[in-house]
């Protein structure tokens, strides 16, 4: 059996769920566990502790706004969004919360959340949202790798660099 401190198995991206309601985390783990390696936490502090132990961060996170010690206020959830992005800027964070007024949704997005999803939500719709986010993330990562490779080729083959390499080779021979 795999422990959360190991890398996720190939083909199953890691999903962090942070919600203080065990019924929610259990239901989401059951609904999403075939597509994702689900890691569930009940608080901001537990999520941060877990992140520090992982060899690589989760690709996705579902975050409730109302977390202990103030479950009826969004402060801990907002702080967690900032914490997650500071730890892993490429992580896609989705707020899944019953505290779904427009101001909270705007603030969560301003902090870097990809989307705000109101509770209760349809698990099938949530699966589609997460799958789409992974597709976009993977495309962005491929494009970034290609840009880096192209830049390396450009720099490595520029006329000035080729001339310098030639001069260094001549100098090394003397």
Language model region names:
Residues 22-40:
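Two-component/phosphorelay signaling modules centered on CheY-like receiver
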Residues 35-50, 72-73:
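Short hydrophobic/Thr-rich beta-strand motif most characteristic of the beta2 strand and flanking loop
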Residues 49, 71-90:
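Short amphipathic alpha-helix used as the core "switch/output" element in two-component signaling
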Residues 55-67:
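Active-site beta3 strand of CheY-like receiver
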Residues 103, 121-130:
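C-terminal output helix
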Residues 145-174:
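AAA+ ATPase active-site-proximal loops
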């Amino acid at each position: 059996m795999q422990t959360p401190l190991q890398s996720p198995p190939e083909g199953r991206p890691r999903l962090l769920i942070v919600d203080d309601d065990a019924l929610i985390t259990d239901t989401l783990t059951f609904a999403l566990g075939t597509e994702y390696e689900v890691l569930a936490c009940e608080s901001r502090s537990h999520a941060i502790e877990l992140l520090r132990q992982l060899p690589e961060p989760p690709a996705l996170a579902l975050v409730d706004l109302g977390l202990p010690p103030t479950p009826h206020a969004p402060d801990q959830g907002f702080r967690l969004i900032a914490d997650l992005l500071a730890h892993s800027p490429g992580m896609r964070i989705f707020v899944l919360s019953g505290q779904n007024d427009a101001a909270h949704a705007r603030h969560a997005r301003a902090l870097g959340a990809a989307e705000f999803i109101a509770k209760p939500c349809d698990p099938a719709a949530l699966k589609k949202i997460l799958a789409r986010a992974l597709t976009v993330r993977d495309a962005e990562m491929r494009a970034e790798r290609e840009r880096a490779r192209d830049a390396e080729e450009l720099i490595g083959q520029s006329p000035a660099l080729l001339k310098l390499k030639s001069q260094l080779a001549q100098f090394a021979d003397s």
